[in-house]
Amino acid sequence: MKQILSLITFFFLFNVISSKHEGELYDAGRSTLINLNPMNFDTQITNNRNKNIISFIHFYSPDDGKSNELKEVFIELDKEYSGMFKLAGLNCKKYKDLCSKQGVTEFPTYKIYPPLPAPPMKYEGKIEPKKIISYLGRFVENKAQELNNNNFDDFISSKSSIPKVLLFTNKKGIPLIFKRLSLQFDVSKYIYY
């Protein structure tokens, strides 16, 4: 009887460990990262490309070795930039057909799904937050404009009922957050830098 119980316990533990190993890399309770599957891929990624949403997907196999090491970087990215970019993971051991359909054959693979009409593309850079954000920032449409002495008065006096957003800074260029914010406004003429 003890042998049978030991055998049952062994198989139970083996199944628990195996199912956890094949499970999702990202814990939904720990971040807003989306665990993709065949049921939600189109609604979460494909359909959002028409809405200026940039998605960054980590295609992985639970046993690929590197994904577990790089998981924390992806979670950190999600915490910092979840409102700007959609970050997701896709378990290719579980969903082989979907990964194959996306052209993924090795793991880990990182792909960017920029707004249409740009095609999805493989990210070849280092898996470091600053490098990834810098690369993703290239795909952010910019509707913000720089104010100067020639257009400031026109801006202030035009359409007084519409709220205006101003950023005063001594830095060159328009910050990524302002580029993303400018997309939330219907008319590009009302966000100035």
Where on the chain are the PLM-derived regions?
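N-terminal leader/targeting and pre-domain segments
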Residues: I4-F56, E76, E80-K164, T169-K172, ...
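Active-site beta-to-alpha loop of glycosyltransferases that engages the nucleotide-sugar donor
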Residues: S61-P62
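Typically the conserved alpha-helix immediately C-terminal to a functionally engaged Cys/Sec
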Residues: G65-S82, K172-S188
